[in-house]
Amino acid sequence: MIRKKLDIKKGFIFVLLLVLFDQLIKFYIKLNFPLTLYNQPAIIDLGFFKLLFIENKGMAMGARLNNLLPFLDDYTAKLSLTLFRIIAVFGIGYWLISTLKKNKSNLLKITLCLIFAGALGNIIDSVFYGQLFSSSYGQVAAFWPEAGYAPLFFGNVVDMLQFLTITWTWPE
């Protein structure tokens, strides 16, 4: 059996389709649902998987750069984080292209495509969403409002998927 290798052209198409799919889902969720607040039901709840609408102003799990570096103000921290994301995407992109050119496993290539597409989607969110949408807090966002909820480079990243791998009960 001959296995076809993922080359640059197929990798580019795969990443493009992933980013397009990611953005279409985010647009649909933002324009049809308010933010999922703590203790509110999920949009979709299959037990092991939940679809939530959460916006993240910082990094993973809501951490902000100025939580780690308290001498930074909110403005500088958010701008630095967005610029870091852009620089990181170039690094990930270089790694992806060099891997696609080599005779590496398709699993590695697909994994890097997924990471790159996710990082690119986060950049689109943080750079443009503040201008493209109104606030989603307590309401459904509007597309292309007169004034967005944040300036260019200061939008929130949309996080939606939650896979439950560990469950526990918080002590009261």
Residue ranges: model-predicted function:
Residues 1-172:
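Alpha-helical transmembrane bundles and membrane-interface segments of multipass inner-membrane proteins
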